């Protein structure tokens, strides 16, 4: 299924992206759920899938994490089942992500899907990332507050909430409606009837993640082996003093690594092309030979990217799942980065090069791309 998003992107980016929340009524016309509640519940029984149940009764909140064996103990009100990265495990839901590729691929994270019974929700809370919440089957009431300094608390060790807030948006969403919320705006949603919601979340690494990730890269490649030296050690009034110029020199030693463009690009390509959630990688058995890949494409078969696989381009380099893809065939690499589905036409003359076919075969045999059907 192909989903068509009714949205004036230039206007949205200017007025709302990372600025103000907004309800997009009938963002998807005639919306059809790509997954059923039963299918979602089945996914939450799998150990590889990240899921949780959130419920509340008389002001007391409970959170449990999957995989779940049964749902028989749940009542008819006040609970929600939330499943992360469903687009990694259920191919039809991945189609919901594609209309949002007007925004950079490296900023898009995953598709979280929730099923809620009446009264179900996770309470008032803040997110530090952008999210588009699509209303599927059923109705849900959403409240969004102003972006202010808010006190957070934990009614349960696995649940972070904020205090009650005054709403600037208070709307009942129906199938196909979309609520966009930028980072830092408090919000809460409660199902009015059995309801499905689809949250397209965005990735925003913080400084701590960046420094930690770059440090791992430096250690793995044994970079930064230069030692501090001071042949002209300056005098000081007290031997315990560390002088400002020494602090500057130490800072410069660290910045020198980050300021190497090729290393910084290589690190960030590997870092940001890795998914935060497990992928449904299933290498083909037996593995494909390069000539089999060639024949299949020439016969019109379509090569499809694995759901959730992050394929990104930085300059002339393309990265997939933390690996740099090397090939002199730039148009073919661009096709891998730009297209979800690929045909022989996308690869052009590159298919006649045995080295490119060997590289493509390795990607397919890693489970990153597969033949449709």
Where are these regions (language model features)?
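Active-site region of the double-stranded beta-helix
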Residues: 1-16, 28-177, 185-228, 232
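Long, charge-rich, low-complexity alpha-helical segments
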Residues: 12, 19, 324-373
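C-terminal amphipathic alpha-helical segment
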Residues: 220-292
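Acidic, low-complexity/disordered tracts enriched in E/D and polar residues
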Residues: 259-337, 361, 373
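Short coil/turn segments at secondary-structure boundaries
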Residues: 55-56, 265-270, 347-348
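Short polybasic amphipathic segments
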Residues: 51-55, 142, 315-321, 371
